[in-house]
């Protein structure tokens, strides 16, 4: 379902001190933007921000870059992030929110940024053959991620889509990533530390199992 236009979103984002209007300016120097040397985690397709809001407010010693493309969804993410921090009485200084085409992620990140972990949660499965190269786990995307992932950097990938998950296993192999952990039913796996996204809650209520893996960058 297409999200309705939200005229308030762009002005509210531009007045937000953790929204980055021109992320290309920080390429290669994101630690400087955070003003510390803490590890950086990257969420690709942050949606309404529920996931990064919980993660960031619970882990003040980790920096988070959260990316999506539409102002409408980023505006909601901004509000959800602020709400999570306010409820926990936490200072919001470890999240940077921005609009960026993920297919061009190397415009804003490079090897100097040394990203420790990437989260890909319930991305578009692009089931048609001619569209599969758009998948966030496709080999050509993984090659981009390798440029800025640190040595032994991780990708945490969750999806409800069986075909996407199975084909992504081959993508990771082609992209020289080792599968460190895999489950076809995350919620009965005993894996600790999972934070549910809004999509994950919806699919779980429908009885759809969440597939999950952790892939490690290899030399």
Curated annotation (Swiss-Prot):
S-adenosyl-L-methionine binds at residues 43, 68, 101, 124. The keyword Signal does not apply. Its EC number is 2.1.1.33. The keyword Transferase applies. It catalyses: guanosine(46) in tRNA + S-adenosyl-L-methionine = N(7)-methylguanosine(46) in tRNA + S-adenosyl-L-homocysteine. Keywords: Methyltransferase, S-adenosyl-L-methionine, Transferase, tRNA processing. InterPro entries: SAM-dependent_MTases_sf, tRNA_(Gua-N-7)_MeTrfase_Trmb, tRNA_methyltr_TrmB_bact. Pfam families: Methyltransf_4 (PF02390). GO terms for cellular component: tRNA methyltransferase complex. Pathway: tRNA modification; N(7)-methylguanine-tRNA biosynthesis. GO terms for molecular function: tRNA (guanine(46)-N7)-methyltransferase activity. Belongs to the class I-like SAM-binding methyltransferase superfamily. TrmB family. Catalyzes the formation of N(7)-methylguanine at position 46 (m7G46) in tRNA. This is tRNA (guanine-N(7)-)-methyltransferase. It comes from Clostridium botulinum (strain Eklund 17B / Type B). The lineage of its organism: Bacteria, Bacillati, Bacillota, Clostridia, Eubacteriales. The gene is trmB.
């Amino acid at each position: 379902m297409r999200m309705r236009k939200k005229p308030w979103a762009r002005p509210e984002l531009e007045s937000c001190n953790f929204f980055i209007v021109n992320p290309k300016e920080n390429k290669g120097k994101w630690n400087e933007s955070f003003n510390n040397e803490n590890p950086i985690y990257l969420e690709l397709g942050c949606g309404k921000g529920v996931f990064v809001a919980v993660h960031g407010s619970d882990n003040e010693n980790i920096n988070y870059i959260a990316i999506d493309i539409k102002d409408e969804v980023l505006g909601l993410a901004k509000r959800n992030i602020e709400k999570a921090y306010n409820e926990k009485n936490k200072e919001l200084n470890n999240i940077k929110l921005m609009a960026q085409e993920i297919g061009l992620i190397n415009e804003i990140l490079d090897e100097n940024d040394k990203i420790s972990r990437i989260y890909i949660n319930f991305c578009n499965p692009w089931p048609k053959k001619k569209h599969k190269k758009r998948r966030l786990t496709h080999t050509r995307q993984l090659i981009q991620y390798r440029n800025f992932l640190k040595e032994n950097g991780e990708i945490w990938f969750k999806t409800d889509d069986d075909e996407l998950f199975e084909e992504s296993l081959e993508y990771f192999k082609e992209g020289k990533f080792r599968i460190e952990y895999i489950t076809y039913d995350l919620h009965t796996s005993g894996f600790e530390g999972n934070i549910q996204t809004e999509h994950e809650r919806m699919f779980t209520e429908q009885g759809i199992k969440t597939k999950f893996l952790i892939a490690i960058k290899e030399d």
